[in-house]
Amino acid sequence: MLKIEHLKKSYENFSLDCSLEVKRGHVTGLIGQNGAGKSTTFKAILGLISYEHGDITILGKPLAQFTAKDKQDLGVVLSDSGFSGYLTINDILPIMENLYKNFDKSFFLEQVEKFQLPCDKKIKDFSTGMKAKVKVLTAISHHAKLLILDEPTAGLDVIARDELLELLRDFMTKEEGNSILISSHISSDLESICDDLYMIHQGTIILHEDTDVLLSDYALLKVDDEAYAGLDKQYLLRSKKESYGYSCLTNQKQYYAENYPQIAIEKGTIDEVITMMIRGAA
């Protein structure tokens, strides 16, 4: 559905070098700190910024050959864009009908009613959660095949985030083959919906893994200096010096559980995996 190969973009104090793939029928997450390169990647995918090197293929077509007609199959949410705050939902309806030949007005209005969004109130007067719902609803209401969502849950409370994620789950079950690329710095959001995750740091992908594998096979080993010295390190991804000795990140939890029953092994959260990949030593 989407493939990026060696995408390179340079700014004065930042360089992006990114490769990733979103498979058909998959939800793929891009997670990283603010400023890690998520938004730059998304803008390059959509042709909103130029880039120095790399290949981007969307729905089987090179980006350079992607037409306005092809864009009908994309649903997009960007963190710094959307409809004018001076428009109402009633104003948006004819715009959507003109933009997208497959705009499902009845579905859109059904969701508007479900979320109790006022149709005659200016969007600038909506709450943060209401604005986010409008963005996502416009992305999913024209039978897109691929959603590209940059931080759609940013700034939302737990309830609003859960409601948005439920919309995305429904999108994935609507039509076979639908796919999503979604970014966030909130790991729990991506953990609950993504099939696989890419972790980006300072413009570079530092880890790609299936979400199930991250949650089942990754772990933190907590060992003192003596235990660390005697540890088989072939399955350690990162190590970090601590006051008690070392914390070590592995993707082979079972190996260490079987061969080192005396050491402390903790299930690593995605946040802990990210922290270790960034701050730990290889």
Predicted regions and their residues:
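Pre-Walker A (P-loop) beta-loop-beta motif of ABC nucleotide-binding domains
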Residues: F14-G29
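Helix-to-loop junction immediately C-terminal to a conserved catalytic motif
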Residues: L46
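C-terminal coupling/interaction segments
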Residues: L236-A282
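ABC-family P-loop ATPase nucleotide-binding domains
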Residues: Q72, L78-K135
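Catalytic Walker B motif of ABC-type/P-loop ATPase nucleotide-binding domains
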Residues: L147-E151, L156
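ABC transporter nucleotide-binding domain
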Residues: L165, R169-L181, H185-T250
